[in-house]
UniProtKB/Swiss-Prot annotation:
This is Cobyric acid synthase. The gene is cobQ. Belongs to the CobB/CobQ family. CobQ subfamily. GO terms for biological process: cobalamin biosynthetic process. Pathway: Cofactor biosynthesis; adenosylcobalamin biosynthesis. Catalyzes amidations at positions B, D, E, and G on adenosylcobyrinic A,C-diamide. NH(2) groups are provided by glutamine, and one molecule of ATP is hydrogenolyzed for each amidation. The active site is at 333 (nucleophile), 435.
Length: 493
């Protein structure tokens, strides 16, 4: 296909493909290119809703913002959202098309998936100067290569000069590079135009003998040695939550997020982590809840299964007791549903059909349906401060109904749309369907100020920018750092 492109693959998962791809998008955008990110197939529970209501991986949305363009579904034509029991929801060009187990996925979706990839690339070619493609995992998985929709099949289709990224932080980098190249077909290996050594810590001169050997051994230049930057870049995989730092020396507030097994859109909490006076801690449902300033139940792809786990581990009771003692609890999306009175799944969308009792902290009843809601929203807040503009997006299959209350003032709509969330009269129990809630700077600060007041702390200014401005600065910083250590000359026409 005649389209200018760069492919980024990695020797392993977590090599840093997303970071490098994102940085290249911003670097080339700053040089005047009209760039589109692309990932043929992504498996992730962090999703974003485009303007036309389609779902893509959140990482591709970040890459689009890095490129200075609006996210499109064509930038991630296949999104797989794991649901447990070795099954995933399959989303093609933004729309859910089915649920399938791993064994049957390629049998049912390989051909339509590749057509969606081809059509998406052809569409992007009409609108952009260059596409930056990101692979997944490793391009040299022998048992998967014949049905790989994401790595070298895309590179060959585009005849794309390809970067091979390796993580040196965990050790074994040289073996990973040589082994990967040995396992590629000659046609694939010919496309590898440079190696990037990522996550390097230490003195560069100590690495030079290894680089010299690698270049002589493979005949491929090392075009970049990138310092360790992962701490300033949002993680895509929930496993990375285990490695996040939870301690801040000067944190005034401690917020605990329950790390549900199928936690989704934990990017919702990046803005909280960016607050200098807030420490965010992720705990498993089996850990002690402790006494934080607030507890958050995040989104989840398997609401009922995670609700049952919370009940089995005692975390559900711990949260109920915490709320009864005056603690602040917030549920987002699936977490909001869990805080309600009941969740019903009559069609067995999430697994076994049935009705399940929630934590009964909010007066809502939820029914899981086959029709997913995915849309961007612009609303106005009622709490914690009246009239604040709030932007975000919904992604959920449940329909929640607010139950009538004897005391009409006991619970109030959180926004000017009652269907988007509730808060109790004490402003202790909150629930919302809105992802990206904390991205809204004034709303985030107003919510945090309520927690600060409970601690007797001075309120912080609420006239702050939305998180997207911090994200833009982060993307600029990452791009500048990568550009200082990466030679893109062999990859540009």
């Amino acid at each position: 296909m005649a389209m200018k492109s760069i492919m980024v693959v990695g020797t392993t998962s977590h090599a840093g493909k997303s970071l490098i791809s994102t940085a290249i998008c911003r670097i080339l955008s700053r040089r005047g290119w009209r760039v589109a990110p692309f990932k043929g197939q992504n498996m992730a529970l962090n999703a974003y809703v485009t303007a036309n209501g389609g779902e893509i991986g959140y990482a591709q949305a970040v890459q689009a913002w890095a490129a200075g363009v609006v996210p499109w579904v064509e930038m991630n034509p296949i999104l797989l959202k794991p649901q447990g029991d070795m099954t995933s929801q399959v989303i093609i060009r933004g729309r859910p098309v089915g649920r399938v187990n791993a064994a049957d996925y390629y049998e049912q979706y390989f051909e339509p998936g590749w057509r969606a990839i081809e059509e998406s690339l052809q569409h992007l070619a009409t609108e952009f100067d260059l596409v930056v493609c990101e692979g997944a995992g490793s391009p040299a998985e022998i048992n998967l290569k014949h049905r790989d929709l994401t790595n070298m099949r895309v590179a060959k289709y585009l005849n794309a000069p390809t970067l091979l990224v390796v993580d040196i932080d965990r050790g074994g980098a040289f073996a990973h590079v040589v082994g990967t190249l040995e396992l590629l077909d000659p046609e694939e290996r010919q496309l590898i135009k440079g190696v990037v050594i990522n996550k390097f810590r230490g003195q560069r001169s100590l690495l030079d003998p290894g680089i010299k050997w690698l270049e002589e051994r493979t005949g491929i230049p090392v075009v970049g040695v990138i310092p360790y930057l992962q701490e300033v870049f949002p993680a895509e995989d929930s496993l990375d939550l285990l490695e996040r730092k939870t301690h801040k020396a000067h944190a005034d507030l401690q917020i605990t997020v329950v790390r549900l097994p199928r936690i989704a859109n934990f990017t919702d909490f990046d803005p909280l982590e960016s607050e200098p006076t807030v420490a965010v801690k992720y705990i498993s449902p089996k850990q002690d809840l402790g006494h934080p300033d607030a507890v958050i139940l995040p989104g989840t792809k398997t609401t009922i299964a995670d609700l049952i786990l919370l009940q089995k581990t005692g975390m559900a009771e711990a949260i109920q007791n915490y709320a009864a003692s005056g603690g602040t609890v917030l549920g987002i999306c699936g977490g909001y549903q869990i805080l309600g009175q009941m969740i019903a799944d009559p069609e067995g969308i999430e697994g076994q059909a049935g009705r399940y009792q929630g934590l009964n902290l909010l007066p809502i009843r939820t029914v899981i349906t086959g029709q997913k809601i995915a849309r961007q929203r612009q609303v106005s807040s009622n709490f914690p401060q009246q009239g604040l503009p709030v932007n975000g997006f919904e992604i959920h299959q449940g329909r929640s109904r607010v139950e009538p209350q004897g005391d009409s003032q006991a619970f109030q709509p959180l926004f000017d749309d009652v269907n988007l969330g509730l808060v109790d009269s004490c402003q202790s129990v909150w629930g919302s369907y809105l992802h990206g809630l904390f991205d809204n700077g004034p709303w985030r600060r107003a919510w945090l100020n309520r927690l600060r007041q409970q601690r007797g702390l001075k309120s912080l200014p609420t006239g702050v920018a939305n998180y997207r401005e911090q994200r833009e600065q982060m993307l600029d910083n990452i791009a500048t750092e990568v550009e200082n250590h990466l030679d893109l000359t062999p990859f540009l026409p």
